[in-house]
Amino acid sequence: GAIVVSHRRNKGLAETFRSEMKECLEQKADIIVHTDADGQYHPLHIPQLIEKVQEGYDLVLGSRFRGKRMRHMPFTKRFGNILFSKVLSSLTKVRITDSTTGFRAFTAELAREIDFINTFTYTQEQIIKAAKQGFKITEIPIDSRRTRKSRLFKNPFQYAVKAWINIFRIYRNYEPLQFFGKIGLSFFS
């Protein structure tokens, strides 16, 4: 059977993710598989995610951009994801092609070690913090289904602004000298 954890009212993606990790750790899970509730990700990829964790990876992302082309994803979302992924790849020194995927598997150790500060989303924060703390990250190609319009993120621009703020905050916390140094240098350029 499954253990279902729910909130009486919508607390957002990040809080739901935190509750999920807490419950999984209380249940003594070794590997945690996360998928969004909208049915976008096909569960037949779950064994592949778990297999990669068993091979020694700490965080395995299901990438919608490795392999097949994402024709059903709106252009603005696709463009934003590619841009986020390039920035995250640069910050983490790990090749990331799908930084907003909600389909991932990770170790209990990673769940215990990463403390989330964001109240908005968890996707980029988990990747950055896992990389900065030395956890091994990889991706597997997955298929995804077209889903209805997002109820969480009605405005892609608003999502992008909040996500960029989150990325800058994490970068500032992990690399303060580089972060403030680059800001300072920009004033003297």
PLM features: what roles do these ranges have?
Residues D36-Q40:
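The conserved acidic donor/metal-binding loop of glycosyltransferases
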Residues G1-V5:
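Acidic donor-binding segment of Leloir-type glycosyltransferases
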Residues K93-V94, I117-S189:
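Hydrophobic helical membrane-anchoring modules
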Residues Y41-H42, I140:
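Hydrophobic alpha-helix-in-membranes signature
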